[in-house]
Amino acid sequence: MKALLDLFKQVQQEEVFDAIKIGLASPDKIRSWSFGEVKKPETINYRTFKPERDGLFCAKIFGPIKDYECLCGKYKRLKHRGVICEKCGVEVTLAKVRRERMGHIELASPVAHIWFLKSLPSRLGMVLDMTLRDIERVLYFEAYVVIDPGMTPLKARQIMTEEDYYNKVEEYGDEFRAEMGAEGVRELLRAINIDEQVEQLRTELKNTGSEAKIKKYAKRLKVLEAFQRSGIKPEWMILEVLPVLPPELRPLVPLDGGRFATSDLNDLYRRVINRNNRLKRLLELKAPEIIVRNEKRMLQEAVDSLLDNGRRGKAMTGANKRPLKSLADMIKGKGGRFRQNLLGKRVDYSGRSVIVVGPTLKLHQCGLPKLMALELFKPFIFNKLEVMGVATTIKAAKKEVENQTPVVWDILEEVIREHPVMLNRAPTLHRLGIQAFEPVLIEGKAIQLHPLVCAAFNADFDGDQMAVHVPLSLEAQMEARTLMLASNNVLFPANGDPSIVPSQDIVLGLYYATREAINGKGEGLTFTGVSEVIRAYENKEVELASRVNVRITEMVRNEDKSEGAPEFVPKISLYATTVGRAILSEILPPGLPFSVLNKPLKKKEISRLINTAFRKCGLRATVVFADQLMQSGFRLATRAGISICVDDMLVPPQKETIVGDAAKKVKEYDRQYMSGLVTAQERYNNVVDIWSATSEAVGKAMMEQLSTEPVIDRDGNETRQESFNSIYMMADSGARGSAVQIRQLAGMRGLMAKPDGSIIETPITANFREGLNVLQYFISTHGARKGLADTALKTANSGYLTRRLVDVTQDLVVVEDDCGTSNGVAMKALVEGGEVVEALRDRILGRVAVADVVNPETQETLYEAGTLLDETAVEEIERLGIDEVRVRTPLTCETRYGLCASCYGRDLGRGTLVNVGEAVGVIAAQSIGEPGTQLTMRTFHIGGAASRAAVASSVEAKSNGTVRFSPSMRYVTNAKGEQIVISRSGEALITDDIGRERERHKIPYGATLLQLDGAAIKAGTQLATWDPMTRPIITEYGGTVKFENVEEGVTVAKQIDDVTGLSTLVVIDAKRRGSQASKSVRPQVKLLDANGDEVKIPGTEHSVQIGFQVGALITVKDGQQVQVGEVLARIPTESQKTRDITGGLPRVAELFEARSPKDAGILAEVTGTVSFGKDTKGKQRLVITDLEGNQHEFLIAKEKQVLVHDGQVVNKGEMIVDGPADPHDILRLQGIEALSRYIVDEVQDVYRLQGVKINDKHIEVIVRQMLRRVQITDNGDSRFIPGEQVERSDMLDENDRMIAEGKRPASYENVLLGITKASLSTDSFISAASFQETTRVLTEAAIMGKRDDLRGLKENVIVGRLIPAGTGLAFHKARKAKEMSDRERFDQIAAEEAFDFGTPSTPAEEPQHPAAE
């Protein structure tokens, strides 16, 4: 049997392997791969089109052109297989060996591999400890390098010019050896004793103290140790033999007209061979040194450009002046091997067409055009035709199908029954972008799509196209049906909301049907059942919106759980409702009460309704319900016949007066500006403010008029009811349009923005109903075009962010049920400015509790640790008012190389605990990247109009309770008896009667407190007030003011107020001061006591110093007596520079890339007491003395705002200088939990602003990946180097091993890497190479002899295995288990088998042996 199979050379079962190893090939290895040396640059004979012998396409080396036929035609047919023809030397075998047989070129002079020379940091440079510049000069024959100094005073590796060399030769004769070119470098590499060097470096590392040296040594040590560990010899970085790619991989294709198209590689190889042959000839002829040298340099350059064209010097160009595509270009970049052919392949059995709406389909169906189906399912039809005996051969079957005989259509129906197909709409931004459907054959050429899945695909029917793919194997069909069928994917994986929500006309229909009208036809009637209502409606006795009373039968869950008892029992009750709602009650699934329908159904309500159905009635009932909702919606919208016309856009009559008043106010400001009372900036801000307020007012008047209408009720009185205006209904229901759009139609368009985001102060007072004049139209085109340009940029940027996110998380898969960790994070409701932005229930829903949840009133355990908190649980927790729950989080999961299900919690797309094998990393990346296109690109200029709205001047309680101050709150009582806040980060909390936090408010510096700690207050009570326009500088001590460095014209300037004539002193910017000396001084105040001594800070020797910052208006006079809490100076808020707040997509990218902000705030490194040291030029010195008495200094620029004061005690990680937080500092000083809270909250802020919901755990998953490397601080007895960054899991594994062996484990600190960095520093070199910087990644991996264990998804896709996620994870687990048991069973046999089979001799397979050694 085996012989028979061999005869036809069946596709062999590919090698099973668990890892891939990469390394440098030794010259002998390259020769062993080769099937012969390529000696001539010729390719094919242009007359006979046969390959030239010994040329680049030689049949003798690479194999026959035609299957089983030698070149001269002496041997043809299978029977001669394996014969080598004596005439032409060609082996008789398959032609496809030309894809795998390699050749080689023996180089006449060695050549350095450009990747190891020029890819930074230069590996050759590191091994030789020489600079790149020097090595290059040697390699390209510009200088000599000393190889063996002998007895001379020269040093090894010394560089000398030609002149030097000749002088030294005259001086020392042949006492020493110096060489040029790659030979010299090879000699140096051979001379290196790696073990010795490593020992030496390790001792030097221990003994040195300088940072720079440590860094340098560690780098070099890493490279040398890599060589040592991998057993690769450094001299292999210099090539003596050049391998030649198999000819089929660099084809030469005849075009019509006798021309040839060829791969660039052939050109590059040809140059190498030409130069190599010329060099050989020159060496034989003993040509002069200078000619040989030139030839050697040209050979080096030819090999360089073959390997990586354009890396050094100018790129080699072909006939048409474009750079040739070298081997490196073949693998890197978007069009390279990795991204083009391995990660994204075109697949067979697929087609695409335009989509149209299919309202008659069920949720799990799609309409497939007959012709498409016929083409896609061809093989199945052929098979069926043969089985049925209609056709005897495939050829006959083909004919039948082509003629489209009736029997073929019958068979097609049969074939596609229960055979799901996958539909995909590009761009596939999340996993719902591909779903499976059962095909329904339709006439026409467009694919029909169910309306409810449009939201998931983000599809509309304005010409969108979709692709169809057919899963072929039974396993694929099974997976498509169970995992991907549209009716099994009804929730968004990003947030757990339903994805099958109706939109547009469906919503409009349902909304119209569930509205109620006063005094509709038939109001007040009572009906015995829904069928009676329907009959009355059909006979036009009642209107849809009339209020009626109806007896409605609901199916409720049966309390009786005994055997045979029905699950649902009917319950009849009388409801006051409307006709439309009663009719809709027909489609309610059992288990839902009628009350969910008994209200106007807007889009949000419908979404909530479907969600409730899913939680209460399960998946099947929900899908059926959604389908019926859709059908009813369409039907009712048609019956309603809603249309819009110009008269529906009601312009409010008050508009004229409102706009007129505003114009008057603007005129008044212009007048003030002309008389110099206000600055240009203030005028602009005020004008913009006026117009935005006006726009609001007009909009409000318009909405009031539009949203209600007068109506006569049954008793004949006039009253107002919600309007049935078509435009209003569309916006109110959420079907189409929004209040803002209606305002533009019927109110006023308002202010427009310039492309740079600044606001044009002339508003557009017209609306679209009145029409715009030319100027107004021109102004509005400005912003509109910017919008379009933005969208294009946004899409690209968003796509790139998604790609980076996917890359960093692609190997994160749930691999076990529970890691057993007792760590977690404490979740609280998210409160901002006293508002609850996100309730606790939303934050803990679907998480696993890590500690018991206790009822605060009775102290009994509600939910044990390890419980998955579902809807009922979080509702109960909310009802009891528990304000903090400790839950598990992906960040603290202790699973290595993956995550555990308990730390992840609920799979949001399914609503149950996540399954083992779920690729949660990719899902997280998609959930964050998918809404990326909805985020804005723009950065917000805070200044002018925008900040005006944000200025608050007081804070008031929103609920009843008790005031509590945070520990950081400090205040003093001034002479008037007012409490003035002197802490920068004080907060006031409002707690309820059990002591649970209800609100939290920040109280700024200088605020006056109106309520003290422990005061009981009612909602609406003011807690504190402050002046929003200025920020005071307040003294905490009393005394007499003594100015220091306050010199008029030097550090301060006198300003006289135009209106009041009072003068104040203003501190001027150090940069604008005259002399050098005055730049470093800082105006400040000291206080003197009654005896004229300086007031000291209690308990210290320091005098009280209060510094004034730039722009401060000093309000006290020298020698003035001041009391505690008095204001010394004010800083106008206006003069604070308008700072740009990065918003939208760039902000998200900034957070995930972990970039340090420009003027980052400074955090205290230690816990201790603050004091100010001696100021240096332009900087002030802040000293923190820790509890042991050590001093830690910080230099702070003068213009920065210091948040602490002399003598204040600060905690480690507390902010001491104002500014945006630096995530690296947060991690270092406050730990992982604080960092995660920071990143999660910041990212969520951006998305929340756009109204996008994303679950926190997705962001946490990404933060986990950003923290996956650790830096070794002390290597203990491990194999790591101090300062090295390693994978956390590796480190833990190694430490476990050390502890098991009783050695000293390594200690480490956490490192935060940006997502790009993290993707590139992964342990898998295949994944990193396919992401970015392919050359660098591969160079590094080759030297280290890296081994890729194929843990992630990407690596496995690239090598073509099943991915280790989902069903693939189970497959690999089973395979490994089987291998383990087999290995034990067959240990004996294995030894003999290995002897039989040996290793496969196909050179292409060579690097792919199981690297399990």
From Swiss-Prot:
Annotated source species: Burkholderia multivorans (strain ATCC 17616 / 249)
Cofactor note: Binds 1 Mg(2+) ion per subunit. Binds 2 Zn(2+) ions per subunit.
GO biological process, one term: DNA-templated transcription
Family membership noted in the UniProt record: Belongs to the RNA polymerase beta' chain family.
Residues annotated for Zn(2+) 2 binding in this entry: 819, 893, 900, 903
Subunit structure: The RNAP catalytic core consists of 2 alpha, 1 beta, 1 beta' and 1 omega subunit. When a sigma factor is associated with the core the holoenzyme is formed, which can initiate transcription.
Reactions listed under catalytic activity: RNA(n) + a ribonucleoside 5'-triphosphate = RNA(n+1) + diphosphate
Cofactor field: Mg(2+); Zn(2+)
UniProt name for this protein: DNA-directed RNA polymerase subunit beta'
Keyword Nucleotidyltransferase: yes
Transcription keyword on record: yes
HAMAP family hit by this protein: RNApol_bact_RpoC
Enzyme Commission number: 2.7.7.6
Pfam family, one: RNA_pol_Rpb1_5
Keywords: DNA-directed RNA polymerase, Magnesium, Metal-binding, Nucleotidyltransferase, Transcription, Transferase, Zinc
Entry binding sites for Mg(2+): 460, 462, 464
